[in-house]
Amino acid sequence: MLSCYRNCKHFGVCGGCSSPQMEYASSLKTKELALHNLFAPLIPSQNILPVIPCSPLLRGRNKMEFSFYQTVDGEKTLGFISPSKPKKGIPITECLMIDERAMDILNITRSWWTAHPDLSAYYPPLNKGSLCTITVRVGNISNDFMIILTTSGREEFAVPLNIIQEWQQSLLDSGLPITSIFWEEKLSARNSPTTFRTTHLYGAPFLKQQLSIDGRSSLFHIRPRSFFQPQSLQAEKIIQTIKEFIDPCGEETLLDLYCGAGIIGILLAPYVKKIIGVELVPDAVASAQENIQLNSVDMEVFLEDAKQFCKRNENLPSPDIVVIDPPRCGMQNRALKYLLRMAPKKIVYVSCNPLTQIQECSVLVEQGYQLRRMQPIDQFPHTNHLENIVLLERLS
């Protein structure tokens, strides 16, 4: 059923959903048509598979971040920051995209903030203020929570540990199924990358997620900064599509660029001969290695930039298949150049940003690849965004 019974009370102001929840079918068709028009120069329409709708339409998000906000007059809100100008803090009391108990977590945090009026909201342009965000992650096995409070790491805005522990205890007293609580301190300095100092306050150091394809289930430990697809059921459909696109016979070598916590490679490992993962983020590599061991999978992971890995291995035997699932900015030119020198037979490109994806697919097509098939999957209902998976094959 491609509709919802009502719209969220914050629709139109919070900056989250850009189309009414009650009009999902029409908004999905609009997104699909836009994607067809965008990729028309590269692929015949009949090779674009029908978009896979999001399921469930409501309460399916496994992660959401909420922001602390404060006006110059001192009015405080916890929720979303509107995209309007001037920006406004929207005190979210309902969100149809995530488990409704997330609102209990926000309400507990609001009460704690009210009890400590000296704590100010963080203001990124000036790197001032104490409270940044609260992130709620939901496990799909026990519907339990990981909660991450992010505050400023600047000494003059630091939040004392005993105040943090008050917040922690309020959450634990609520009776909510909380698996783990983390406190992150954001360390920002001009002309330097932002880093985080993490304190594990309570419970397990990870949240459990389970994904299955072809009846095979794999368990994943997701840590505070692990990337995981935002809709667990849609993630299974993404990986199932990748498997169908590569059509493995069991003798292939598969290179998983931007492998993150190893999820794609681990789920595809039973179908190919060898899996190699490449990831730049140390925390993600640690998670990947943990998940590889957890699932008894033979997969090698390199802590390396994708460009450097491709450059270092450009003269070695080419992998049969390369799966790339890069950030929204894409692979970028130099990484793409070295990937082309590796000349894999098949490339599966997964992207949440089709504008970047088509630019890089155009380069691949110019250099001897053909875009064979395309499968859009909706992970972001009621927004303008689509996940898109394309299969490119090297012309002989």
Curated annotation (Swiss-Prot):
Q: Which InterPro entries match?
A: MeTrfase_TrmA_AS, MeTrfase_TrmA_CS, SAM-dependent_MTases_sf, U5_MeTrfase_fam
Does this UniProt record's set of keywords contain Plastid? no
PROSITE patterns attached here?
A: SAM_MT_RNA_M5U (PS51687), TRMA_1 (PS01230), TRMA_2 (PS01231)
Indicate which residues the UniProt annotation says bind [4Fe-4S] cluster. C8, C14, C17, C95
SUPFAM superfamilies with a match to the protein in the record = S-adenosyl-L-methionine-dependent methyltransferases
Q: What is its EC number?
A: 2.1.1.-
Q: Where is S-adenosyl-L-methionine annotated to bind?
A: Q229, Y258, E279, D325
Question: What EC class is this?
Answer: transferase
One GO BP annotation is: rRNA base methylation
The Swiss-Prot or TrEMBL record annotates one GO molecular function as:
rRNA (uridine-C5-)-methyltransferase activity
Key word Transport present: no
The alphabetized UniProt keywords are:
4Fe-4S, Iron, Iron-sulfur, Metal-binding, Methyltransferase, S-adenosyl-L-methionine, Transferase
Active site residues of this protein: C352 (nucleophile)
Family, as annotated: Belongs to the class I-like SAM-binding methyltransferase superfamily. RNA M5U methyltransferase family.
| NCBIfam families (UniProt xref) | rumA (TIGR00479)
Protein name, entry field: Uncharacterized RNA methyltransferase CT_742
Annotated organism of origin: Chlamydia trachomatis serovar D (strain ATCC VR-885 / DSM 19411 / UW-3/Cx)
Q: Which taxonomic lineage is given here?
A: Bacteria, Pseudomonadati, Chlamydiota, Chlamydiia, Chlamydiales
